[in-house]
Amino acid sequence: MPKLKTKSGAKKRFKVTGTGKVMHAQRGKRHGMIKRTKKQIRQLRGTRVLFKTDGDNVKKYFLPNA
């Protein structure tokens, strides 16, 4: 049976760490920033770890070779 292809949209959105955790960009920074405080905007920087169950689903269905 051939290998499953990785979903190209997931390649751009998720990164798997060496320990198997799935990292993703923080949500909520596309629009509507004018009504947020500087502290709120600053805290949205960087990446976060997905919950284990969500990360397992991402690896199973979207990143099968990770």
UniProtKB/Swiss-Prot annotation:
Residues 1-40 are annotated as: Disordered. Residues 1-15, 24-40 have a biased composition (Basic residues). Disulfide bonds: none annotated. GO terms for biological process: translation. The keyword Ribonucleoprotein applies. It comes from Bradyrhizobium sp. (strain ORS 278). The keyword Membrane does not apply. PANTHER family: 54S RIBOSOMAL PROTEIN BL35M, LARGE RIBOSOMAL SUBUNIT PROTEIN BL35M. Transmembrane segments: none annotated. Keywords: Ribonucleoprotein, Ribosomal protein. Belongs to the bacterial ribosomal protein bL35 family. It holds the Pfam family Ribosomal_L35p. GO terms for molecular function: structural constituent of ribosome. One of its GO terms (cellular component) is cytosolic large ribosomal subunit. The gene is rpmI. This is Large ribosomal subunit protein bL35.
